[in-house]
Amino acid sequence: MAVEEIHAEMVSSVWKVLVEPGSAVAAGDTLVILESMKMEIPVLTERAGTVGELHVVEGEVLQEGDLIATVVDGTTAPSRG
């Protein structure tokens, strides 16, 4: 079973969380939306599966490299964009 770890690519704030642990996701689905320098940055999953763990909450400030979520291969869902 493969696990995708999704990390913050820059210092940012968690603006909106769109999934929860156990949510089925398709490749390309948006998991959370970050905000940095007044820009909204969608964080996407690269694989279909199930959200295993969610490590952020709305309003939290992230540093580059912080773990946002894990996605476990398996359950798939239609893309929600």
What are the functions of these language-model segments?
Residues 22-31, 36, 59-68:
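A structural signal for short beta-strand/turn segments enriched in small hydrophobics and glycine
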Residues 1-13, 30-46, 79:
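Short beta-strand-turn/beta-hairpin segments enriched in glycine/proline and small hydrophobics
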Residues 19, 36, 41, 56, ...:
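Short, conserved catalytic or interaction motifs in soluble domains
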Residues 16-20, 24, 53-56:
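Short histidine-centered loop motifs in beta-beta connectors
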Residues 54-81:
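C-terminal structural segments of small proteins and small subunits
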Residues 5, 11, 18-19, 40, ...:
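Generic alpha-helical hydrophobic packing signal
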